[in-house]
């Protein structure tokens, strides 16, 4: 799909930042309007992250206009908002391929463009990486500048504050731009603050400020008085105290949709020494009324008709696993007031909207703080409550030490509802749930369950919730299989289920690839086992299958290395059972983006691929 660039005459003149910087500043508002419309048209035809990009159009234009990218380093935290950046950095004609197999990466990606200096996807990493680049630039001595753009959600994470504390301590030259799009820090936006921001970022103010510090450095009482006076004056109109205490010079807030003010402020700040923080106020979804009204709903969108102002409903009548979890959560809370649900800023994605409204006293959104979420849950468990941590597989990686040190070592009854296990699709390498079975399986005291359908998912959630120790239920992104939902009951811990009896080959399946493995088993006349438990492994059943069959095949949507299949290998070797085993799962690579079914087919994890791998191995 390509758009007629003639409909965007100003944007047509800015194929890359070098061309952008040749435009007169008077044309920048027109460029922003066209860029926003181009983004709307592209995403509506191809799907993708939407509202975040609309909110940073003016900022993106101003940054590339003022800074000498790619020589100067521009870092986008998370990367949802980087579509305008990609459009302006030579990728305009390919933007419609974003998040698709073999298309543009969903986030800034080092291998894709020299303008993407940091590969991202997870939040709150930009300031740490930016500080490292700033230190390297100082050692390089070529005047390279470093700019980090971070949102008001991502900046709440501990890692961001750790980085700012370090930056303030070593006084490196860098600019952090706080993109505040939810009015959560300050509402002081207007002409006075825009004027003040330009004044405070100007060379005269900076020279007076630094000169005053030097002149009175030998007179502590006067120096302290000047500092208090400055903070008092700034504090009247800006929330600077926190960032100043961390060692940053605070400028703002600035209207993030006034491209001329942004450009002038950035020019003023470009050569300032030490760590600087520019606070801008933006509207997520800016320029498209439905997205402005519901920025969460329009965060990531399928193809849609811009004229209708509505998103198409899912064509599947089957509930998602996230919804299955959310319904179970409400069902359980209705019977047990001890249930406490914890999520690190993933309420919508984890299916917890209904629960948060119906049981607000039992619901905790701890923001982007995965480490805190897990240890907070440990504290709830110690206090006699029954915490359920709803978290994506890829984000649980960020709390691995807490999982071990604060939960598992103490054998605390915390249930982990791990969403997005396995291949997640369009978000690519940074979001695949490829490693959770591997990194959890080695932790003592853990019970790890992998359901084959939505009914098993419910039963496992119930089992894990009532288990007196740490437990994890790991389920995929996507819809269920129309399985009949049976009454909830405790599953016997560490026991699998024989689904089909065959000959010679026994397929041991962990998780929702069971339906694909079933088709392969029927074509191969193989035995099929729904293993259910990754840990503790059903050793008796595995050894029985080894005794009755010539070969074993393990199937899982997790990294082969260290995964469930590795557990089968370890058991057989420990018991001296010399049975050949084929492990089928995710290979030793970071799986790129693509539709889930596309990637399963490419990796040999659909029915045909499983059968093909087995036949090739036996040949």
Swiss-Prot record:
Its cofactor is Mg(2+); thiamine diphosphate. Its EC number is 2.2.1.7. InterPro entries: Dxylulose-5-P_synthase (IPR005477), THDP-binding (IPR029061), Transketo_C/PFOR_II (IPR009014), Transketolase-like_Pyr-bd (IPR005475), Transketolase_BS (IPR020826), Transketolase_C (IPR033248), Transketolase_CS (IPR049557). Thiamine diphosphate binds at residues 80, 121-123, 153-154, 181, 288, 370. GO terms for molecular function: 1-deoxy-D-xylulose-5-phosphate synthase activity; magnesium ion binding; thiamine pyrophosphate binding. It catalyses: D-glyceraldehyde 3-phosphate + pyruvate + H(+) = 1-deoxy-D-xylulose 5-phosphate + CO2. Binds 1 Mg(2+) ion per subunit. Binds 1 thiamine pyrophosphate per subunit. The keyword Transferase applies. SUPFAM superfamilies: Thiamin diphosphate-binding fold (THDP-binding), TK C-terminal domain-like. The keyword Magnesium applies. GO terms for biological process: 1-deoxy-D-xylulose 5-phosphate biosynthetic process; isopentenyl diphosphate biosynthetic process, methylerythritol 4-phosphate pathway; terpenoid biosynthetic process; thiamine biosynthetic process. Pathway: Metabolic intermediate biosynthesis; 1-deoxy-D-xylulose 5-phosphate biosynthesis; 1-deoxy-D-xylulose 5-phosphate from D-glyceraldehyde 3-phosphate and pyruvate: step 1/1. Mg(2+) binds at residues 152, 181. Keywords: Isoprene biosynthesis, Magnesium, Metal-binding, Thiamine biosynthesis, Thiamine pyrophosphate, Transferase. Gene3D superfamilies: 3.40.50.920, 3.40.50.970. GO terms for cellular component: cytosol. Homodimer. Catalyzes the acyloin condensation reaction between C atoms 2 and 3 of pyruvate and glyceraldehyde 3-phosphate to yield 1-deoxy-D-xylulose-5-phosphate (DXP). PANTHER family: 1-D-DEOXYXYLULOSE 5-PHOSPHATE SYNTHASE-RELATED, 1-DEOXY-D-XYLULOSE-5-PHOSPHATE SYNTHASE, CHLOROPLASTIC. Belongs to the transketolase family. DXPS subfamily. This is 1-deoxy-D-xylulose-5-phosphate synthase. The lineage of its organism: Bacteria, Pseudomonadati, Pseudomonadota, Gammaproteobacteria, Enterobacterales.
């Amino acid at each position: 799909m390509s758009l007629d660039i003639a409909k965007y005459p100003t944007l047509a003149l800015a194929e890359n930042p070098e061309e952008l910087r040749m435009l007169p500043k008077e044309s920048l508002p027109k460029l922003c309007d066209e860029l926003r419309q181009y983004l709307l048209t592209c995403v509506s035809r191809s799907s993708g992250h939407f509202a975040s990009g609309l909110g940073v159009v003016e900022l993106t234009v101003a940054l590339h206009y003022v800074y000498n990218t790619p020589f100067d380093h521009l870092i986008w935290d998370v990367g949802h908002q980087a579509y305008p950046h990609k459009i302006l950095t030579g990728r305009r004609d390919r933007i419609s391929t974003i998040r698709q197999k073999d298309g543009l990466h969903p986030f800034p990606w080092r291998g894709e463009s020299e303008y993407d200096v940091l590969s991202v996807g997870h939040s709150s990493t930009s300031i740490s990486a930016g500080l490292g680049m700033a230190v390297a630039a100082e050692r390089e001595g070529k005047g390279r500048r470093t700019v980090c753009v971070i949102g008001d959600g991502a900046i709440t994470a501990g890692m961001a504050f750790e980085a700012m504390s370090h930056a303030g301590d070593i006084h490196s030259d860098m600019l952090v731009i706080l993109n505040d799009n939810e009015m959560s820090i300050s509402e002081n936006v207007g002409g006075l603050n825009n004027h003040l921001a330009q004044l405070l970022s100007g060379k005269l103010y900076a020279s007076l400020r630094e000169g005053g510090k030097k002149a009175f450095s030998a007179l502590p009482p006067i120096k302290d008085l000047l500092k208090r006076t400055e903070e008092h004056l700034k504090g009247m109109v800006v929330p600077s105290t926190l960032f100043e205490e961390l060692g940053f010079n605070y400028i703002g807030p600035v209207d993030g949709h006034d491209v001329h003010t942004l450009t002038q402020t950035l020019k003023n700040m470009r050569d300032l020494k030490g760590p600087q923080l520019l606070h801008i106020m933006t509207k997520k979804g800016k320029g498209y009324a439905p997205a402005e009204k519901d920025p969460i709903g329009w965060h990531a969108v399928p193809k849609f008709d811009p004229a209708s102002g509505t998103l198409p409903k899912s064509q599947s009548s089957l509930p998602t696993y996230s919804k299955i979890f959310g319904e179970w959560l409400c069902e359980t809370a209705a019977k047990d007031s001890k249930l406490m649900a914890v999520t690190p800023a993933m309420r919508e994605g984890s299916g917890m909207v209904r629960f948060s409204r119906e049981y607000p006293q039992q619901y905790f959104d701890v923001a982007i703080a995965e480490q805190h979420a897990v240890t907070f849950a440990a504290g709830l468990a110690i206090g006699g409550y029954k915490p359920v941590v709803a978290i994506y597989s890829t984000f649980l990686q960020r709390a691995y030490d807490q999982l071990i040190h604060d939960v598992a070592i103490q054998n605390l009854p915390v249930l982990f509802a791990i969403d997005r296990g396995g291949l997640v699709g369009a978000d690519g390498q940074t979001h695949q749930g490829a490693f959770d079975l591997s990194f959890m399986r080695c932790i003592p005291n853990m019970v790890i369950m992998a359901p084959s359908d939505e009914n098993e998912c419910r039963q496992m959630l119930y089992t894990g919730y009532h288990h007196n120790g740490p437990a994890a239920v790991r389920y995929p992104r996507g819809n269920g299989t129309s399985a009949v939902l049976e009454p909830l009951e405790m599953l016997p811990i560490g026991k699998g289920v024989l689904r089909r009896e065959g000959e010679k080959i026994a397929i041991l399946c962990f998780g929702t690839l069971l339906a694909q493995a079933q088709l392969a088993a029927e074509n191969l006349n193989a035995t099929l086992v729904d293993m259910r438990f990754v840990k503790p492994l059903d050793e008796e059943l595995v050894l029985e299958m080894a005794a009755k069959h010539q070969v074993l095949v393990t199937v899982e949507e997790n990294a082969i290395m260290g995964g469930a299949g590795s557990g089968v290998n370890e058991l057989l070797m420990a018991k001296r059972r010399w049975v050949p085993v084929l492990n089928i799962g995710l290979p030793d690579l970071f799986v790129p983006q693509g539709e889930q079914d596309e990637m399963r087919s490419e990796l040999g994890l659909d029915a045909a691929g499983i059968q093909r791998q087995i036949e090739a191995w036996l040949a």
